[in-house]
């Protein structure tokens, strides 16, 4: 069983990679779930439900031993750890699970990713609008958009992911985790 975990900011090529290289496997995409629940993939009002459904789908696929592409930004080791914990919590044969982390290197190029998102939105492709300015939750609008915030998070996880993998493999000798750099 293969669990593909792309790590990348909006516009880094996560969905494009899946469509091109893994078109026939189950995709779990929180944006798609948001659209199904709220009618808008940018609407975060039902986010708790979105994530509950995503992890329920992941556990069901694990029980059925089905390959999965977990299509989210996955910009923290905490997010990846939750996927890992969910799969191993439901797996019947832990030695048959292969985690394939796809580090989307185009995430290093903030402007390229921003231009891809803008082009999609201009062409009315239904996607989350990460070009909106960030609200600091204190009533202030910050002078950058969500892509900039995601870019900063990517630069951190890009360093942390290898240490996370080493620790997991040391703690769980059955863990099979590969990291592949995709793009730039």
Positions of PLM-derived features:
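ATP-dependent NMP and nucleoside kinases share a basic, alpha-helical "lid"
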Residues: 36, 75-125
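Conserved GTP-binding G-domain of TRAFAC-class P-loop NTPases and closely related GTPase folds
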Residues: 2-7, 12-15, 24-26, 94, ...
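Conserved substrate/cofactor phosphate-moiety recognition/catalytic segment
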Residues: 12-68
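Conserved beta-strand segments of the P-loop GTPase G domain that flank and frequently precede/overlap
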Residues: 69-71, 101-105, 181
């Amino acid at each position: 069983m293969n669990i593909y975990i792309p790590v990348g900011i909006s516009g880094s090529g996560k969905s494009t990679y899946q469509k091109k290289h893994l078109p026939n496997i189950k995709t779990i995409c929180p944006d798609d779930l948001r659209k199904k629940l709220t009618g808008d993939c940018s609407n975060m009002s039902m986010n708790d439900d979105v994530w509950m459904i995503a992890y329920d789908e992941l556990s069901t696929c694990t029980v059925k031993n089905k390959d999965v592409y977990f299509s989210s930004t996955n910009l923290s080791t905490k997010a990846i750890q939750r996927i890992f914990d969910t799969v191993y919590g439901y797996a019947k044969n832990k030695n048959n699970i292969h985690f394939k982390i796809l580090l989307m290197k185009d995430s290093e190029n903030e402007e390229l990713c921003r231009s891809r998102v803008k082009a999609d939105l201009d062409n009315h492709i239904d996607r989350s609008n990460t070009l909106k300015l960030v609200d600091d939750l204190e009533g202030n609008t910050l002078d950058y958009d969500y892509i900039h915030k995601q870019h900063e998070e990517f630069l951190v996880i890009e360093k942390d992911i290898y240490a996370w993998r080493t620790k997991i493999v040391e703690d769980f000798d059955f863990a099979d985790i590969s990291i592949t750099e995709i793009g730039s």
